[in-house]
Amino acid sequence: MATEQISDGKRARLIPTEGRAELRATSALLATLELVRPFSIALLGPLGASKSKRATVKTYTEPTFRSNGRKRRLDGWLEVGSGSGPHRSLNALVETKVGKNKHTVEQINNYLTVAREDDFDCLITISNEVAPAPGVHPTKGVESGADSKTPVYHLSWLRVLATARETLSEFDQGVLERKILEELIYFLENKTAQVLSPQNMSRTDWNAVRAGTQRDGLRRGNKGATFVAKEWDLVALFLKSPR
């Protein structure tokens, strides 16, 4: 079991008080996923995690593994239980970047080796980079997608923030889960978290769709247009956030 291979991991804390910016952001996010089930359903459900409201979520920071004779420490690990009914559990490693930092192919391949050796279901990367197209990782040379034996899923901090804000509307004022989400949003939008404003609109699909609209040449069902429309929804949610 993947959980038996973890050493030195710490339970994710909602209010991290030490560590580098990446670790603090990871800890706050993972702890919120554990405490606010509708948020974890919205963010992790599309990655294959159980959508059962009764499923439990456990999260850790800085799990350490041995791979190829070396110790490798990742930013996080999460487990979503199966809950009730025909749902599946999900064990995932999490690696994050903040600011202008980007994942490299070598890093991701090293973490994929750990995930495969220790029977994790997938690797989740989070950064300020926005994927250029659905199912395409922003790091060139990385093969990702649900059809892979150990898929690599990428979430932008923009998507995390937009999903948190969208989930916020499900709760009435005074509800504890709402307060937790509000604090996560406040934390991530603070400049010290180094979660940047929307960027990377110059990537492949954005350019192609912009050029197509200028030529009046977009066809019905254009996948690039669909992707750009969804990403723009995220940008709009971000811009609507109180600053």
What are these regions (language model features)?
Residues 1-243:
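Charged, terminal alpha-helix-loop-beta segments
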